[in-house]
Amino acid sequence: MVFISWKGDQAKSGGIASNIGVHFYDMLCWIFGDVKENVVHLKTADANAGSFRLKNANVRWFLSVNYNYIPNEVKAIGQRTYRSITVDGEEIEFSGGFTDLHTRSYKEILKGNGFGLDEAYGSINTVSTIRNLDAIGLKGEYHPFCKKILKS
């Protein structure tokens, strides 16, 4: 379980937003542009959620390591993870393809094909901001999965 290792320790990994979110935020900024506004709706040990106003998109995001928050239709097919983004009403599910991702990335870094500070700054700044913001609850443009945890 993630809470037993350093990954679930806020002081060691930065928590959910830093540990697993940084990659997602990096992808979002690469596709949709820089973060213009950053709001946090939910912060618990096993889930974080918020919303971004990016240069070219508005995004509601939800991250969790809790299997109970995965949609029932995803659990029904035996899937243990769920990664999805909906753009203009069309869902793109991208849960697969992450096997050995870190190992492959580290090999590329050792070959000199890593990323510099300029490429990493936006994502690191985003997670730092999230870590320092207070959660506002079910206000504004929150992700619908927040209702699995919070009550109006």
Where are these regions (language model features)?
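C-terminal helix-rich "cap/oligomerization" subdomain common to oxidoreductases
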Residues: 107-152
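Conserved S-adenosyl-L-methionine
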Residues: 35-44
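Predominantly a Rossmann-like dinucleotide-binding segment in NAD(P)-dependent oxidoreductases
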Residues: 1-36
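Electropositive phosphate-/nucleotide-binding environments in soluble metabolic enzymes
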Residues: 18, 22, 99, 114
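C-terminal substrate-binding/catalytic lobe of Rossmann-fold NAD(P)-dependent oxidoreductases
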Residues: 45-100
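A general structural signal for well-ordered alpha-helical segments in protein cores
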Residues: 24-25, 102, 127
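Conserved C-terminal active-site "lid" loop/helix of NAD(P)H-dependent oxidoreductases
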Residues: 101-107
